C-alpha cells in the first residue's frame, strides 16, 4: 500500500501501475477538504515511490465522485475574497500536481463524475468510462462556475463550442455523447472497466498513445483562429443570454471566462477562472440557488426517512380518469408501480389512456424511451369500470370532480372494496381533508395527495395530513410520491393547504391593483421580466382557469374571512361573470388562438379592457416597485403565517413548495430566502407602507420580533 486515508487508498498493481481509489466512508464520494487534502498527500506519496509507470484513478462506490461538498464550501463563500482566493489556489495546486505527474494517468469512470469529479478526470491524460457513467459540470445550476479548472481544461479537451454548451447548461452527459466530442477515450461494459483502463494505460506507457501531447494541449492556449474565436464567443453570448436571461449571471460568466482565458496558458487561465468564481460566489443568486439545492436534499432526505416507516406500495389505483387521472396513471406506471384507473364512464377511461399514450409517444419522439418501454408502461395501467378491480391496491388516489358530496360518496364506496390495510388519498385542491375523512370508517388511513397540473411536468406533490391521518399513512404516501419521481412536502390541513393558500393572496394583490386602475398586461410584464415569475398573475389565472380561480377564491374567503373576504366584485368576478374562463374557452384576461404547433397563443383582447374599465374606471400607471410590493407582500406574509401556524414544518419545505409548485423564481430562492436577502426589518417597513390596504398586508407579531433582533429564517 502506497498510501491510505479514510477517503483514498493507493496501491501498486502489476506492471508498476498505481491504483488510486476514492472510497469515502459515506454512501458516495464527495470533494470535501478532507478528500482534497488526502488527494494531495496521496500524490506526494506517489511522487516519492520508485518505479511507478502509470496511475489509474477509480472509485470504490457506484459513482466516481458526485461533486463538491456544498455544505462545507458555503462557509468559505462567506469569507473575504483573499481567503476564497487562497483556498482556490491551494485546491488547484492539487489538480495541477495530478496533471503534472511524470508518468501517464487515466481515470476509470463509473456512475456520476460531476463538478469536482469531472474536473478530476479532466486533469488526467486519458479517460475511460463504463456504460453507467454520467459526466458534467453542473455548477451554473448553483449560480457559480467550476472552480477546479473546469473552464480551463474542458475547452482544451473538447473544443470551445462543446465546452460552452456543457458548462453553460450544466447538464450531465451520457458516455456516448462524451465519447463523440472526445471528453472520454472509450466506453466499455462495467465489468471490463479497470481491465480496459489498465490496458489503455499500458498503451500510453509504451508510447502507442501520445499522452504527453494530450497533456500539453491542456496546458497551452486554445488553438482557435482569431476570427473564428470572435464569432464563436459572440454567438455563444447571444444564445446564452436568450436562455439564461439577466437574472442568472453564471452561464454568461462562463462564456466570458473561456473567451478571456483562450489565449492564456494554464496558470493565467486558472486565475481568470478564480476571479469569476469569487465574484459569483458572493451573489444573492448563488446563495438562492445553492439554498434550493440544499433544501431539495433536505426534502428528499425526509422522503427517504419516511420510506423506512412506510408500508410497501406494490400496486395503486386512481379513481377518475380523464387528463388528471391519466397523468397520475402514467406517472405511477412509468416509475414501476402498476395502477388501476377506474371511472364510471368509458369515454373518460379512453381519454385517460390516450393521455398516458400521448405522454409516452412524446418520450419516444425525444429519444428518451422506446416502443418496447412504452408497451411495458401501458401494460402497467389497467382501465376499468368495475370497483372490484381495486381490491389489491395498496394506495388509492381519488381524483374525481372537485365537489365535496361527490368525493365523499366515492371515498365511502371505495373503502368498502379495498383491503383492510389499503391507504386512500384524495387529490383535492380546495376541499378540507378533515371534512372528507368524515365519510370514512378508517380516517387514520386517509390523507390528501395533491398533484399539480400537468402531472408529468410539475415536480411537487402536497401530502396533506388530516387530524386523524396516522404517521404510517402519511409516510407511505410520501414514499409513494417519491417513488413516482415527485418531490413530496407534508402540510397540515387548512383551506387551500399550503400552495393555494399562499397563491390566492397574491391574486388578491393583483386584483386590488386592477381595481385601482392598473393594466393587467403591464403587471404581467413586471412580474415576469423583473421579478422573474414564469407567468404574470393575469396569464397564470387564464392558464389555471378563471372558473377554477373563482371557486377557489370563494373557498379561501370562507376559510379566512378576516383578510380574504372581498367587498364587492373583483377582476376575477368580472371575467367569470362574462364567461371568460381563460385558455380553456379561448378568452380570459387575454384571448387565445392556436398556433401552428397546436399550442395556445396569447393575444391582447380589447374586450377584457372594456369590461375592467366599466367595472373599475380609468387606467392609471403604477411603478414596477409598487406592482411588485402590492402583489408579493400578501403572498410573503401568508407564507410566514403558514410556518407560524405549523401548516408547513420548515422554511426549506415552504420554499421548495413555492419553487416546485408555483414556479417562484429560483434565483430568489423562495419566500424565506427572499425575506432573508431583503432583510426582515426592511420587509416589515415596506409592508407597513401598504398596511392601509387591509388584512393581507398586516405583518405578524413574530415577524416584528424577528425584525427587531435582525433575525433571519435560515441560519446565517
From Swiss-Prot:
Residue segments, region Enoyl-CoA hydratase/isomerase: 1-189
Binding site for substrate: 296, 500, 660
Active site location: 450 (for 3-hydroxyacyl-coa dehydrogenase activity)
Residue numbers spanned by region 3-hydroxyacyl-CoA dehydrogenase: 311-716
Family annotation (SUPFAM superfamilies): 6-phosphogluconate dehydrogenase C-terminal domain-like, ClpP/crotonase, NAD(P)-binding Rossmann-fold domains
Cross-referenced InterPro entries: 3-OHacyl-CoA_DH_CS, 3-OHacyl-CoA_DH_NAD-bd, 3HC_DH_C, 6-PGluconate_DH-like_C_sf, ClpP/crotonase-like_dom_sf, Enoyl-CoA_hydra/iso, FA_oxidation_alpha_subunit, FadB
Site (Important for catalytic activity): 119, 139
Disulfide pairings: none
EC number: 4.2.1.17, 5.1.2.3, 5.3.3.8, 1.1.1.35
GO cellular component, one term: fatty acid beta-oxidation multienzyme complex
Keyword annotations of the record: Fatty acid metabolism, Isomerase, Lipid degradation, Lipid metabolism, Lyase, Multifunctional enzyme, NAD, Oxidoreductase
Gene Ontology MF, one: long-chain-3-hydroxyacyl-CoA dehydrogenase activity
Pathway: Lipid metabolism; fatty acid beta-oxidation
Gene Ontology terms describing biological process: fatty acid beta-oxidation
Record keyword NAD present: yes
Binding site for NAD(+): 324, 343, 400-402, 407, 429, 453
Catalytic activity: a (3S)-3-hydroxyacyl-CoA + NAD(+) = a 3-oxoacyl-CoA + NADH + H(+); a (3S)-3-hydroxyacyl-CoA = a (2E)-enoyl-CoA + H2O; a 4-saturated-(3S)-3-hydroxyacyl-CoA = a (3E)-enoyl-CoA + H2O; (3S)-3-hydroxybutanoyl-CoA = (3R)-3-hydroxybutanoyl-CoA
Subunit field text: Heterotetramer of two alpha chains (FadB) and two beta chains (FadA).
Entries under HAMAP family matching the protein: FadB
PANTHER family on file: TRIFUNCTIONAL ENZYME SUBUNIT ALPHA (PTHR43612), TRIFUNCTIONAL ENZYME SUBUNIT ALPHA, MITOCHONDRIAL (PTHR43612:SF3)
Role summary: Involved in the aerobic and anaerobic degradation of long-chain fatty acids via beta-oxidation cycle. Catalyzes the formation of 3-oxoacyl-CoA from enoyl-CoA via L-3-hydroxyacyl-CoA. It can also use D-3-hydroxyacyl-CoA and cis-3-enoyl-CoA as substrate.
Family according to the record: In the N-terminal section; belongs to the enoyl-CoA hydratase/isomerase family. In the C-terminal section; belongs to the 3-hydroxyacyl-CoA dehydrogenase family.
Protein name from the UniProt record: Fatty acid oxidation complex subunit alpha
Organism: Shewanella loihica (strain ATCC BAA-1088 / PV-4)
Gene: fadB
Amino acid at each position: 500500500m502506497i498510501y491510505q486515508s479514510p477517503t483514498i487508498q493507493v496501491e501498486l498493481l502489476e506492471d508498476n501501475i498505481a491504483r488510486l481509489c476514492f472510497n469515502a466512508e459515506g454512501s458516495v464520494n464527495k470533494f470535501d477538504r478532507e478528500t482534497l487534502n488526502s488527494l494531495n498527500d496521496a500524490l506526494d506519496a506517489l511522487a516519492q515511490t520508485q518505479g511507478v509507470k502509470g496511475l489509474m484513478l477509480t472509485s470504490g462506490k457506484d459513482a466516481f465522485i458526485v461533486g463538491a461538498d456544498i455544505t462545507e464550501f458555503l462557509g468559505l463563500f462567506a469569507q473575504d475574497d483573499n481567503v476564497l482566493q487562497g483556498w482556490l489556489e491551494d485546491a488547484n495546486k492539487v489538480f495541477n500536481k495530478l496533471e503534472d505527474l511524470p508518468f501517464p494517468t487515466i481515470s476509470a469512470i463509473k456512475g456520476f463524475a460531476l463538478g469536482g469529479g469531472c474536473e478530476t478526470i479532466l486533469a488526467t491524460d486519458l479517460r475511460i468510462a463504463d456504460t453507467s457513467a454520467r459526466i458534467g459540470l453542473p455548477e451554473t445550476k448553483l449560480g457559480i462556475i467550476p472552480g477546479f479548472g473546469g473552464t480551463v481544461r474542458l475547452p482544451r479537451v473538447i473544443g470551445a463550442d462543446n465546452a460552452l454548451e456543457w458548462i453553460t447548461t450544466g447538464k450531465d452527459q451520457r458516455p456516448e455523447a462524451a465519447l463523440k466530442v472526445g471528453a472520454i477515450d472509450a466506453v466499455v461494459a462495467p465489468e471490463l472497466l479497470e481491465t480496459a483502463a489498465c490496458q489503455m494505460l499500458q498503451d500510453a506507457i509504451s508510447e502507442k498513445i501520445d499522452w504527453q501531447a494530450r497533456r500539453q494541449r491542456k496546458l497551452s492556449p486554445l488553438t482557435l483562429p482569431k476570427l473564428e474565436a470572435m464569432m464563436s464567443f459572440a454567438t455563444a453570448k447571444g444564445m446564452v443570454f436568450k436562455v439564461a436571461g439577466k437574472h442568472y449571471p453564471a452561464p454568461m460568466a462562463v462564456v466570458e471566462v473561456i473567451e478571456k482565458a483562450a489565449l492564456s496558458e494554464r496558470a493565467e487561465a486558472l486565475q481568470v477562472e478564480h476571479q469569476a468564481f469569487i465574484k459569483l460566489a458572493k451573489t444573492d443568486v448563488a446563495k438562492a440557488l445553492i439554498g434550493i439545492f440544499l433544501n431539495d436534499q433536505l426534502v428528499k432526505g425526509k422522503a427517504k426517512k419516511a420510506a423506512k416507516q412506510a408500508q410497501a406500495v406494490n400496486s395503486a389505483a386512481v379513481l377518475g380518469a380523464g387528463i388528471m387521472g391519466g397523468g397520475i396513471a402514467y406517472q405511477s406506471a412509468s416509475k414501476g408501480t402498476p395502477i388501476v384507473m377506474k371511472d364510471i364512464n368509458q369515454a373518460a377511461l379512453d381519454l385517460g389512456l390516450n393521455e398516458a399514450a400521448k405522454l409516452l409517444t412524446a418520450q419516444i419522439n425525444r429519444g428518451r424511451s422506446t416502443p418496447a418501454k412504452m408497451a411495458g408502461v401501458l401494460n402497467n395501467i389497467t382501465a376499468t369500470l368495475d370497483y372490484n378491480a381495486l381490491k389489491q391496491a395498496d394506495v388509492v388516489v381519488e381524483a374525481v370532480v372537485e365537489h365535496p358530496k361527490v368525493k365523499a360518496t366515492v371515498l365511502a364506496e371505495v373503502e368498502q372494496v379495498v383491503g383492510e390495510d389499503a391507504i386512500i388519498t384524495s387529490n383535492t385542491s380546495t376541499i378540507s381533508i378533515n371534512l372528507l375523512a368524515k365519510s370514512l370508517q378508517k380516517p387514520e388511513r386517509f390523507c390528501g395527495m395533491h398533484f399539480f397540473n400537468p402531472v408529468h411536468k410539475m415536480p411537487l406533490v402536497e401530502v396533506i395530513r388530516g387530524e386523524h391521518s396516522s404517521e404510517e399513512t402519511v409516510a407511505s404516501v410520501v414514499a409513494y410520491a417519491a417513488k413516482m419521481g415527485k418531490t413530496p412536502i407534508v402540510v397540515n390541513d387548512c383551506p387551500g393547504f399550503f400552495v393555494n393558500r399562499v397563491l390566492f393572496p397574491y391574486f388578491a394583490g393583483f386584483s386590488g391593483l386592477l381595481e385601482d386602475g392598473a393594466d393587467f398586461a403591464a403587471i404581467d410584464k413586471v412580474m415576469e421580466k423583473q421579478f422573474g415569475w414564469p407567468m404574470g398573475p393575469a396569464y397564470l389565472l387564464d392558464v389555471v382557469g378563471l372558473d377554477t380561480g373563482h371557486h377557489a377564491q370563494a373557498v379561501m374567503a370562507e376559510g379566512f374571512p378576516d383578510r380574504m373576504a372581498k367587498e364587492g366584485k373583483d377582476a376575477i368576478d368580472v371575467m367569470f361573470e362574462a364567461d371568460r374562463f381563460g385558455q380553456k374557452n379561448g378568452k380570459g384576461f387575454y384571448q387565445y388562438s392556436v398556433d401552428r404547433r397546436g399550442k395556445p397563443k396569447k393575444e391582447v383582447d380589447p374586450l377584457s379592457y372594456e369590461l375592467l374599465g366599466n367595472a373599475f374606471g380609468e387606467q392609471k400607471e403604477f411603478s414596477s416597485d409598487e406592482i411588485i410590493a402590492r402583489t408579493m407582500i400578501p403572498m410573503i406574509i401568508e407564507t410566514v403565517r403558514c410556518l407560524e401556524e405549523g401548516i408547513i414544518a420548515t422554511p426549506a419545505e415552504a420554499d421548495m413548495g413555492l419553487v416546485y409548485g408555483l414556479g417562484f423564481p429560483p434565483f430568489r430562492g423562495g419566500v424565506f430566502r427572499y425575506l432573508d436577502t431583503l432583510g426582515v426589518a426592511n420587509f416589515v417597513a415596506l409592508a407597513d407602507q401598504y398596511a392601509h390596504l387591509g388584512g393581507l398586508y398586516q405583518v405578524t407579531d413574530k415577524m416584528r420580533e424577528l425584525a427587531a433582533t435582525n433575525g433571519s429564517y435560515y441560519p446565517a
